[in-house]
Regions:
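Charged, amphipathic alpha-helical segments and their flanking helix caps
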Residues: 1-30, 35-39, 49-138
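A short catalytic or substrate-binding loop motif that flags glycine-/basic-rich loops and adjacent residues
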Residues: 42
Length: 138
C-alpha cells in the first residue's frame, strides 16, 4: 500500500511541471488556510496547495480511498474578462493532469471529484478541487 505522504509527494511532482508554487499543507482551520495563502509569494502564482481531507475503506475494506483537496490559487482580477478567465482555465489545467476518468500514478488511481470556489482573501481567487485517490489494500 502506498502511504498518504507518498501519494501527496507524487501528486506534487506532477503539479510542479505546471504550477509555479506547489505546497503540501496540513491546514485544518480557516486561520491556518489564510496563513498558508499569505505565505505564498504573489509573484509565484498560480499556486497549488495539496490538503488532506480524509480516508475511508470501501468494498469490504479491500480498497482505501484517500481524499485530498487541491486548492488552486491565483491573484484576483477585476475589470477584465480576459484576466478573470485565466482562473477559469486552471481547472482545465488540473484535469489535463488528473482527467475525470482517472489516472494511475505509481499504483494509485487518482481522479477529480468536484470543484468549488474557496477564496477568503480579497487579493486572491481560489478553487478547491477534490481529488479521490484509490488503491487496493490486499
Amino acid at each position: 500500500m502506498i502511504s498518504l505522504d507518498q501519494i501527496a509527494l507524487n501528486i506534487a511532482a506532477e503539479l510542479r511541471e505546471t504550477f509555479s508554487t506547489v505546497r503540501i499543507c496540513a491546514v485544518q482551520t480557516p486561520e491556518q488556510f489564510l496563513a498558508e495563502i499569505q505565505a505564498i509569494n504573489p509573484e509565484k502564482l498560480p499556486a497549488a496547495l495539496i490538503v488532506f481531507d480524509n480516508f475511508v475503506f470501501s468494498a469490504e475494506s479491500t480498497i482505501r480511498e484517500d481524499k485530498l483537496t487541491l486548492v488552486i490559487l491565483d491573484e484576483f482580477r477585476c475589470s477584465s474578462d480576459e484576466r478573470a478567465l485565466e482562473l477559469f482555465k486552471l481547472p482545465c489545467t488540473v484535469m489535463d493532469i488528473f482527467p475525470p476518468h482517472g489516472r494511475d500514478i505509481k499504483g494509485v488511481w487518482i481522479y477529480p471529484e468536484d470543484c468549488t470556489s474557496c477564496s477568503t482573501l480579497l487579493d486572491y481567487a481560489a478553487l478547491a478541487i477534490g481529488l479521490v485517490c484509490k488503491q487496493g489494500i490486499i
